[in-house]
Amino acid sequence: MPRSHNIEDYRNFGIMAHIDAGKTTTTERILYYSGKSHKIGEVHDGAATMDWMEQEQERGITITSAATTTFWNGKRLNIIDTPGHVDFTIEVERSLRVLDGAVCVLDGNQGVEPQTETVWRQADKYHVPRIVFVNKMDKIGADFYRCVDEIKTKVGGRPVCIQLPIGSESDFKGIIDLVRMKAVVWQDEALGAKYNDAEIPAELLAKAEEYRHILIETAVELDDDVMSAYLDGVEPDEETLKRLIRKAVRYITFIPILCGSAFKNKGVQPLLDAVVDYLPSPIDREAIKGVDVDTGEEVLRMPRDEDPFSMLAFKIMDDPFVGTLTFARVYSGHVESGTTVLNSTKDKKERIGRMLLMHANNREDVKEAYSGDIVALAGLKDTRTGDTLCDLSKPVILERMEFPEPVIEIAIEPKSKADQEKLGLALAKLAAEDPSFRVSTDQESGQTILKGMGELHLDIKVDILRRTYKVDANIGAPQVAYRERLTKRVEIDHTHKKQTGGTGQFARVIIVFEPNEAGAGNVFESKIVGGSVPKEFIPGVEKGINSVMGSGILAGFPVVDVKATLIDGGFHDVDSSVLAFEIAARAAFREALQKGGSVLLEPIMKVEVTTPEDYTGSVMGDLLGRRGQVQGQDMRGNAVVINAMVPLANMFGYVNQLRSFSQGRANYTMQFDHYEQVPAGEAAKVQAKYA
């Protein structure tokens, strides 16, 4: 089956924003107006098409990014709806990795919020071109111009308006299109309401001309010929201006700003036009880099059907009807169902069975997928998030994704033997779907430990275990994921000697242990020359060191950011073995932890509290009482926004406390920022509790 659309007519884009900015509602309207959805789903009545997990419909937030294909003006739109809650940042990161562009939705009243900053940084990391849609222009307190200003001051973007609002709050009637210099006015707020072009209202003409002047002056910088014509008094025509805006978006030179109210059905069609006109197609983006498996050299994969096939898996989901679904993007070449391909990350073959195009939770079988397509594959055995699937004869590993470390953990105990068996299977599936969710076993108690990015993240996992997998279990209180690290360099000379008749055990190691840079991870290096430790025993040294990394000496927490260098040692021709060196290295590391000034580290969270002015003192005092460091405060409308760094250990149950002293009027967001040493007094309490 040939392509239905040329690759230059594809738009692979995501919709990203802070929680409650109206992201899912905007997507619902896009699906409605582009003809994919015949009944509009409202988030607040739990019927949105994109939010199809039970937990999402109840909580009114988007947890998993659902991929949807739809069409507008002859272009094929592959939309990824991403979650805005900070505990699900991993979902945003995964979807941005495979997108060519993004629509950043802002709440017209709230402006740039903490999670907006987070997703903006992630989009910067992957160089994702974007446009901004200032939503909720009908909301009380909506301020389009403040939102534009905050893009500059809070995320360092270069905003350029291509639309202006006509009215705001209950008087919001439509938009001014600065490219065509026309007003676009909606007749009413009903679904599918008609809209007409009109002349720009006289009272807004001067402002429209001022902002169009800024748009043109900024756009002509991108083309010398257009610039010189403009300096000679010739303004660019509509087509030229669109071409320049498209170029600006592609290279992230400036960010076009649009506005509307998705809920009131105003501004969605012009937003769709902007997606088609300005966001890049797969061929406008740089070729994806990979590593040739055979040679180890960097190679490029071009978005062409005739290139060798390569595809990146970016999401695993368990579907109640189809089983495990692997969402993947084809970067080069094409693939047919029934083909055997290579998972080059795992060096295992996979057979492509069913291939599905997804519309939220409806699905359509397809026989072939081409470069630029985003499809769901059913029945893959070994493929996980971040794995590459490719042509057997041209193996390549595409860029891998990086996932954050979990900062919070809970213990879970199944109530019966039957629950124990179900729990094991369910946790394996959940961990495969979400790389930021980890499962481990406590060595001493034998308890199963779940680790995640926040309380809500783990709440939802437990909810899924109970509802979807019918596991009945007791859940422990959330615990902080502390870490341990060395503070000084130590050199340890340790000899392991054991003689019990017959062959004995002998190994001597001299290892330098020192703190690595924060976040650099644990590193092992061998500097053995002259064979004082034969090379076949060196893996035993590394294994011994790694076995201690998982449990430090202070309170049994993982040891992080240590560099271990094997510099010398000794062996016996008969009594030395890999096991002997493993035991020696383990003992050496434990000694190093004793002598190297081990300290406890704790996760520090970036907290932003938005509160009416009356409660500012209470909020500040409470944060300081939680060992918080207030970084500053500013006004947002008539509310005060307080920024602070607070240890996670002191943030449990904060939401209830905040509600009680602000009568429910203050709210907060929190995200992991960094690890920091625990003060001595607090460290003693932690050690007493866990050691």
Curated annotation (Swiss-Prot):
Keywords: Cytoplasm, Elongation factor, GTP-binding, Nucleotide-binding, Protein biosynthesis. One of its GO terms (biological process) is ribosome disassembly. Residues 8-283 form the tr-type G domain. Catalyzes the GTP-dependent ribosomal translocation step during translation elongation. During this step, the ribosome changes from the pre-translocational (PRE) to the post-translocational (POST) state as the newly formed A-site-bound peptidyl-tRNA and P-site-bound deacylated tRNA move to the P and E sites, respectively. Catalyzes the coordinated movement of the two tRNA molecules, the mRNA and conformational changes in the ribosome. The gene is fusA. The keyword Protein biosynthesis applies. It comes from Methylocella silvestris (strain DSM 15510 / CIP 108128 / LMG 27833 / NCIMB 13906 / BL2). GTP binds at residues 17-24, 81-85, 135-138. GO terms for cellular component: cytoplasm. This is Elongation factor G. It is found in: Cytoplasm. One of its GO terms (molecular function) is GTP binding. Belongs to the TRAFAC class translation factor GTPase superfamily. Classic translation factor GTPase family. EF-G/EF-2 subfamily. It holds the Pfam family EFG_IV.
